Design a protein with these regions (language model features):
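ATP/nucleoside-binding phosphotransfer catalytic cores, i.e., glycine-rich phosphate-binding loops
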Residues: 71-147
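Accessory alpha-helical/coil subdomains and C-terminal extensions
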Residues: 1-71
Length: 147
């Protein structure tokens, strides 16, 4: 429903967002900020191992997986687990229009974060901001849970 109203006398909120956003953020970015490179890898039933490794070899410091359904890693599961084990954050998101990516031991390996309901594009931006703020994967997951 409506969060509130924007009228000539000001903005009135009746419902506040549950997640942090915009000015209520821990991230500090200015014109001189260079964010870490994050690549989005689209995964489907015909995805072949090697594409995620190629992105890392080309300079990606983090990866966002645009998976099917609930963020499935498809044929890239072992490759992505190895990349995450090397300390390169991997965020699981979905390329479908709705739904959440939840933490689940069947799909998620150590070093991976669940992107909740964020699109792959929003996940890539948040992962870059999170990586600038921390290299700790638990802290990065907390940021994905918060925004």
């Amino acid at each position: 429903g409506l969060l509130g109203y924007a009228d000539p006398d000001g903005i009135v909120f009746y419902h506040l967002p549950a997640k942090r956003h915009t000015l209520a953020t821990e991230f500090r970015v200015d014109a001189a900020t260079v964010l870490p490179r994050v690549e989005i890898i689209y995964v489907g039933t015909t995805s072949q191992p090697g594409v995620a490794r190629a992105a890392v070899q080309a300079g990606a410091k983090g990866l966002v997986i645009a998976g099917t359904g609930a963020g499935s890693l498809g044929n890239l599961d072992q490759e992505l687990a190895a990349i995450a084990a090397e300390g390169i954050p991997v965020a699981r998101s979905a390329r479908v229009g709705e739904g959440r990516i939840v933490r689940d031991d069947n799909w998620q390996q150590p070093g991976m974060v669940a992107a909740d309901n964020l699109s792959p594009q929003k996940s890539a931006l948040l992962l870059a901001l999170a990586m600038q703020a921390s290299s700790n994967i638990e802290a990065i997951q907390r940021m994905f849970d918060s925004y």
